[in-house]
């Protein structure tokens, strides 16, 4: 980055700018953007990935919250006909305004760690638009995303993301790849929305509710954590052992519990 493009990272935006050329190249090779691709980059920062994505010929929209970076990015990529910059909060961004065809949008980003989980949930609400996602995240978050049942990393984030997507933990990135260096290790993850949900719930909102309630007190048994939603008999009717703890259940079992809740008679209304 030349002097004219220098910008001090801001702690309140969770900014850690990627500068390691080897890591940048490895990320770009993992994404493998093509001229026909429709790309969205969240939090381009100083444009470390942006330059390579534009070089692929893909149409690239970028969303950046930091107003001070907007003129820097506009100047840096002036004249690039495949570059379109949006200043705003990605957590509030309406992805439908991009006009991308269903299942075509490729999303990438070095996500600020303080908003990564809510941003992923926001993107999952638009999973029908998305072909794949490649993110730099805190390594601990990627381990939770990719976790399986039975361990401490398995929880609400794992289950709800895996309900919608296939998760691939690609590789880890050390603090030295960033300026300033974060205090934690990072990792690259690939999320690919399922073309057909492997375990479709009758109502995914009820699945979210079941999972949230179950993991609010993850050391307790299911018959205790879910007693406000399902009786012990209803848990057993879903083919689930109520004496288990939530981390012992796989995604399919949580979907059965949600479907059991969906099948409950609705209270009569006047």
UniProtKB/Swiss-Prot annotation:
Its EC number is 2.1.1.182. Pfam families: RrnaAD. Keywords: Cytoplasm, Methyltransferase, RNA-binding, rRNA processing, S-adenosyl-L-methionine, Transferase. SUPFAM superfamilies: S-adenosyl-L-methionine-dependent methyltransferases (SSF53335). S-adenosyl-L-methionine binds at residues 16, 18, 43, 64, 89, 110. Belongs to the class I-like SAM-binding methyltransferase superfamily. rRNA adenine N(6)-methyltransferase family. RsmA subfamily. Specifically dimethylates two adjacent adenosines (A1518 and A1519) in the loop of a conserved hairpin near the 3'-end of 16S rRNA in the 30S particle. May play a critical role in biogenesis of 30S subunits. This is Ribosomal RNA small subunit methyltransferase A. It comes from Pseudomonas fluorescens (strain ATCC BAA-477 / NRRL B-23932 / Pf-5).
